[in-house]
């Protein structure tokens, strides 16, 4: 029989399967990557038990819980837990604090299915606290290298090629600009933070001399980078990625147009997917219209509509280059040039994709 565990580091480093027995609403507010929600009580049952606990105390609340979850419903839930336990003999279960709900699930599994299955002591709350501490410790003690560069230089491509890199935009499911929204929704803030902390933990444990991250604002779409981590990034050495204007236009076309269209069409089908993709581009352009000014916004919107029409009616994507070129030259490049000037003292290396990738691999290696 395996013992209950409080070794959170081992759980997250090994990707141990975990069964979350909290109510679905609790799970939706924040969970860990790969965990499976198989609740002891659903949201309404938990609500009723909570009211009973507040009014009549723990004993009455436990009795009500047993009356609500009984018979065929109880048997179904036990069967689901047993299936998980058999499929993941190395796993664990947990509730919010690792207390009564976890213990009841353990007892029912033991009594009704003959399965001894360990729990995580301290539950979700303790594991969440551990991951918050991981970020704080990394910000205090870990060296970072920050990858910067103009829009379209391929920073995300470099991040994917450096083993010590943490893909902040991948974890946030957002490319980090007005045009950065993906077809898939962003994770909940807490889920983003949990995934980020686990990623940082795994790379720090691997012994890399420095972790590599892309230069980001405090927010990636609607997700907020932990303040201590972002502040550490602002004080860390920078590497500046360079690429020709033509290369950048092609990369923006690939990622922000063709890739975005493919994501939406795969998700919604050719007609609804294309319309959702077109709406996403229009909305992004509108979002930066106050900074573009009315004349430039009108010109870019017209170019965008012409490109969307060509793409929809004839499958042509080349016309998108027209608005991409104007947007890069007149909007993003001046903005990044200003940012580059402010950060010039922090830049320790410059180069193209191959040179920067090699430099980052060497300087971050174990």
From Swiss-Prot:
Active site: 95 (s-selanylcysteine intermediate)
Transmembrane among keywords: no
Reactions catalysed according to its record: 5-methylaminomethyl-2-thiouridine(34) in tRNA + selenophosphate + (2E)-geranyl diphosphate + H2O + H(+) = 5-methylaminomethyl-2-selenouridine(34) in tRNA + (2E)-thiogeraniol + phosphate + diphosphate; 5-methylaminomethyl-2-thiouridine(34) in tRNA + (2E)-geranyl diphosphate = 5-methylaminomethyl-S-(2E)-geranyl-thiouridine(34) in tRNA + diphosphate; 5-methylaminomethyl-S-(2E)-geranyl-thiouridine(34) in tRNA + selenophosphate + H(+) = 5-methylaminomethyl-2-(Se-phospho)selenouridine(34) in tRNA + (2E)-thiogeraniol; 5-methylaminomethyl-2-(Se-phospho)selenouridine(34) in tRNA + H2O = 5-methylaminomethyl-2-selenouridine(34) in tRNA + phosphate
InterPro entries: Rhodanese-like_dom, Rhodanese-like_dom_sf, SelU
Keyword Transferase: yes
Enzyme class at the top of the EC tree: transferase
Coiled coil: none
EC numbers, comma separated: 2.9.1.3
One function term, GO molecular function aspect: transferase activity, transferring alkyl or aryl (other than methyl) groups
Span of domain Rhodanese: 12-136
Domain of life, per lineage: Bacteria
Signal peptide coordinates: none
Entry keywords, A to Z: Selenium, Transferase
An individual GO BP term: tRNA wobble uridine modification
HAMAP family cross-referenced by the UniProt entry: tRNA_sel_U_synth
Entry's family note: Belongs to the SelU family.
Xref: PANTHER family: TRNA 2-SELENOURIDINE SYNTHASE (PTHR30401:SF0)
Subunit composition and interactions: Monomer.
Function (record text): Involved in the post-transcriptional modification of the uridine at the wobble position (U34) of tRNA(Lys), tRNA(Glu) and tRNA(Gln). Catalyzes the conversion of 2-thiouridine (S2U-RNA) to 2-selenouridine (Se2U-RNA). Acts in a two-step process involving geranylation of 2-thiouridine (S2U) to S-geranyl-2-thiouridine (geS2U) and subsequent selenation of the latter derivative to 2-selenouridine (Se2U) in the tRNA chain.
Protein name, UniProt field: tRNA 2-selenouridine synthase
Gene, per the UniProt record: selU
């Amino acid at each position: 029989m395996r013992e209950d565990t409080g070794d959170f580091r081992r759980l997250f480093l090994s990707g141990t399967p975990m069964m979350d027995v909290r109510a679905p609403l609790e799970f939706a507010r924040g969970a860990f990557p790969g965990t499976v929600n198989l609740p002891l009580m659903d949201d309404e049952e938990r609500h009723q038990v909570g009211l009973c606990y507040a009014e009549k105390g723990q004993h009455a609340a436990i009795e009500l819980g047993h009356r609500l979850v009984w018979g065929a419903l109880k048997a179904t839930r036990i069967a689901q837990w047993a299936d998980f336990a058999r499929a993941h003999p190395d796993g664990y279960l947990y509730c919010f604090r690792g207390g009564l709900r976890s213990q009841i699930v353990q007892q029912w599994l033991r009594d009704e299915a003959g399965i001894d299955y360990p729990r995580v002591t301290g539950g979700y709350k303790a594991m969440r606290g551990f991951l918050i501490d991981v970020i704080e410790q990394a910000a205090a003690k870990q060296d970072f290298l920050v990858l910067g560069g103009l829009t379209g230089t391929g920073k995300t491509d470099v991040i994917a090629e450096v083993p010590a890199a943490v893909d902040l935009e991948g974890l946030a499911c957002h490319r980090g600009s007005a045009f950065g929204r993906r077809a898939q929704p962003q994770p909940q803030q807490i889920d983003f933070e949990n995934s980020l902390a686990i990623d940082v933990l795994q790379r720090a444990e691997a012994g890399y001399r420095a972790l590599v991250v892309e230069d980001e604002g405090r927010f990636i779409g609607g997700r907020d980078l932990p303040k201590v981590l972002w502040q550490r990034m602002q004080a860390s050495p920078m590497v500046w990625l360079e690429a020709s204007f033509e290369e950048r236009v092609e990369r923006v076309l690939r990622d922000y147009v063709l890739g975005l269209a493919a994501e939406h069409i795969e998700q919604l089908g050719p007609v609804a997917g294309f319309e959702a993709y077109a709406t996403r581009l229009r909305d992004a352009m509108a979002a930066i219209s106050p900074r573009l000014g009315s004349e430039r916004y009108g010109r870019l919107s017209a170019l965008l509509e012409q490109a969307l029409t060509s793409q929809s009616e004839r499958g042509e994507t080349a016309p998108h280059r027209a608005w991409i070129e104007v947007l890069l030259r007149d909007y993003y490049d001046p903005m990044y040039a200003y940012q580059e000037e402010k950060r010039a003292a922090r830049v320790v290396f410059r180069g193209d994709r191959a040179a920067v990738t090699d430099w980052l691999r060497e300087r971050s290696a174990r």
